[in-house]
């Protein structure tokens, strides 16, 4: 058995590729069913965010298992092997474990140390459990990754002052406003006519950051009015005008800054829609943090409009990254230790079949000898006395097993453990059962 991760991220693929791999909530069950039906995949879970899609799996055979996951990604994305494979990464065993710990700790994020990824890793654990696709190995790995992510944020300063995708989007708007005025600085958004499209978690974070950057009023559009109004109620100090997506035309006409963050699988804004608007000197900035993208690529270059997507956030991220690199080194040291702990536990499982056979053999001997002893005691031996003798025999077996079992499972080089297992199997004449093969 081998642990593997196959996926892509903002580091390996542009948004136009990532959006084709994104798995929406409505398609997640089908994806789990497909992966669970794969013969080579023993356990599996899926991490799908705006910046990455990663499949974590316990596979029978490394090469065949990874190949099966790649075939799933081809089918899901509709991309050819030639278009997809250059953007994929594959990590195995220790590298896969370390990568997951880095992801959970925020070290592999577009925004170093951002906290939302930890919630997404928690969701990955929950999905794996809900669809009964993770067993003891991945469950242990994923839950330890969550605890590692928490530890990184509590034991280092990586999470302090970290920006998120949403806050980076707001900073990008401030930066572009400043640059349009000939200033390389973040400007207040107080005078901007702002609109947010979508009323999900990312939109909530957007509104929080917009309010903190000087925005006092905005328009909030969503497919359902109730959800938009419910979100608006959480910001009593902000003047929020709610509406439906049917009002998008009017919103485009009167806004100077629009953020999009919907779950739509197709763009809601494209060049055909915008071509009917004459902006004159009134520039409209469109910042899209949706994946798949909410704003079509053909919008770029239209007069009167500037469009940005999640890949454009790099400009803002770079301004904050340098000062955080030393903290990231501290976090990586912690991650290395957590990965080592898991890998030691994983390696110790090599001894489990031998330990189980040894315990089974000794248990058979215990029962046989106990039965002989009890039969010699005669009918006058009470039920209570029988229980005492049986407990005594079990205690002796457990005492005998404790030290060798502890030593067999202790951290040690694989070659040394294999040699110890051979010796135990030879001394106790432990055959290999079908369950161990």
Curated annotation (Swiss-Prot):
This entry's Gene Ontology molecular function terms read: glutamyl-tRNA reductase activity; NADP binding
Among Gene3D superfamilies, the record links this protein to: Glutamyl-tRNA reductase, N-terminal domain, NAD(P)-binding Rossmann-like Domain
The keyword rRNA-binding appears for this protein = no
Q: Which EC number(s) does UniProt give?
A: 1.2.1.70
Q: Which residues form the active site?
A: 50 (nucleophile)
* Residues annotated as site: Important for activity: 99
Which reaction is recorded as catalysed by this protein? (S)-4-amino-5-oxopentanoate + tRNA(Glu) + NADP(+) = L-glutamyl-tRNA(Glu) + NADPH + H(+)
InterPro entries for this protein: 4pyrrol_synth_GluRdtase, 4pyrrol_synth_GluRdtase_dimer, 4pyrrol_synth_GluRdtase_N, GluRdtase_CS, GluRdtase_dimer_dom_sf, GluRdtase_N_sf, NAD(P)-bd_dom_sf, Shikm_DH/Glu-tRNA_Rdtase
User: Pathway, according to UniProt?
Assistant: Porphyrin-containing compound metabolism; protoporphyrin-IX biosynthesis; 5-aminolevulinate from L-glutamyl-tRNA(Glu): step 1/2; Porphyrin-containing compound metabolism; chlorophyll biosynthesis
UniProt-annotated binding residues for substrate: 49-52, 109, 114-116, 120
Q: Which family does it belong to?
A: Belongs to the glutamyl-tRNA reductase family.
Q: What does the subunit comment say?
A: Homodimer.
User: What does the further note read?
Assistant: During catalysis, the active site Cys acts as a nucleophile attacking the alpha-carbonyl group of tRNA-bound glutamate with the formation of a thioester intermediate between enzyme and glutamate, and the concomitant release of tRNA(Glu). The thioester intermediate is finally reduced by direct hydride transfer from NADPH, to form the product GSA.
Reported function: Catalyzes the NADPH-dependent reduction of glutamyl-tRNA(Glu) to glutamate 1-semialdehyde (GSA).
The protein's name is: Glutamyl-tRNA reductase
Gene name as annotated = hemA
